[in-house]
Design a protein with these regions (language model features):
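Conserved helicase motor core of SF1/SF2 NTP-dependent helicases
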Residues: 1-196
Length: 196
C-alpha cells in the first residue's frame, strides 16, 4: 500500500517474492493541488504532477466553532458550484470519520439534503444511502474514488503528525478539478507552521 495513503494503523507485512513498485506520479489532481501537497510535505518524497491541468490553488477556510464549520463548508460548496462544477460532481469529505463527524450526523447542509451512508447494508451487501442531493462521506470511506470538486472539511488537528498528513493527502488527492479545505483554527496554525 502507498504509505502516504495508509489511513488505518495496521502492521504491514511482507509477501515473500513479491515485486515492490514505487511511483510518486499523480495523474488525477491538478498541478496546483500537487504543489500544495509537496509544500506541506504530505508524502515521502516529491509527488510528480502528471495531470495536464494546472488548476487553482486550494481554497482554505477556517472555522472557530460548529456553526462556523457549517457556514464555511457551505461557502466552500457554493464556491465550487460558482466555478461551474456540476452539483452531482461535488463531494464533501469529512476528515473526522463517521463516529466523530458533526456534519455526517446532519440531514442537511444549508438548503441541501445530504446523501450519506447510513451505516447498514442490504441483504445483498450493498450500502444503504439516505436520499439527498449533496454527497457527504468520510475520507476513509471515499478512498479510491474521486470527484471533480472536493470540499475537505472538519480538518482539525494541533500538530501535522503522520495521521493528519495521511488524511490530508488522501482527501486532497480525491479532487480532479478543484479543492476547498475547511480547517479549524488549530489546524490552520499547524499548516501555517509547516509552510514557514
Amino acid at each position: 500500500e502507498d504509505e502516504a495513503q495508509r489511513l488505518y494503523e495496521r502492521d504491514g507485512f511482507d509477501l515473500d517474492g513479491a515485486v515492490a513498485v514505487r511511483c510518486n506520479d499523480n495523474f488525477r489532481s491538478p498541478r496546483a493541488i500537487v504543489d500544495v501537497i509537496n509544500a506541506l510535505g504530505l508524502a515521502e518524497g516529491t509527488v510528480e504532477a502528471r495531470s495536464p491541468y494546472v488548476g487553482e490553488l486550494p481554497g482554505f477556510r477556517a472555522y472557530d466553532d460548529e456553526r462556523g464549520l457549517r457556514r464555511q463548508t457551505l461557502a466552500a460548496v457554493e464556491s465550487l458550484r460558482e466555478r461551474g462544477i456540476p452539483f452531482a460532481e461535488v463531494v464533501v469529505l469529512s476528515a473526522r470519520g463517521h463516529g466523530r463527524s458533526h456534519l455526517l450526523k446532519e440531514a442537511k447542509l444549508g438548503a441541501f439534503a445530504l446523501r450519506k451512508f447510513l451505516g447498514r447494508y442490504t441483504a445483498d451487501g450493498e450500502p444503504v444511502w439516505s436520499e439527498g442531493e449533496l454527497l457527504i462521506e468520510s475520507v476513509h470511506r471515499f478512498k479510491g474514488q474521486s470527484a471533480m470538486g472536493v470540499v475537505l472539511t472538519e480538518v482539525d488537528f494541533e500538530q501535522l503528525d503522520e495521521g493528519a498528513r495521511r488524511r490530508l493527502f488522501v482527501g486532497m488527492t480525491r479532487a480532479q478539478l478543484a479543492l476547498e479545505i475547511v480547517v479549524s483554527r488549530a489546524a490552520e496554525a499547524a499548516l501555517s507552521g509547516a509552510l514557514a
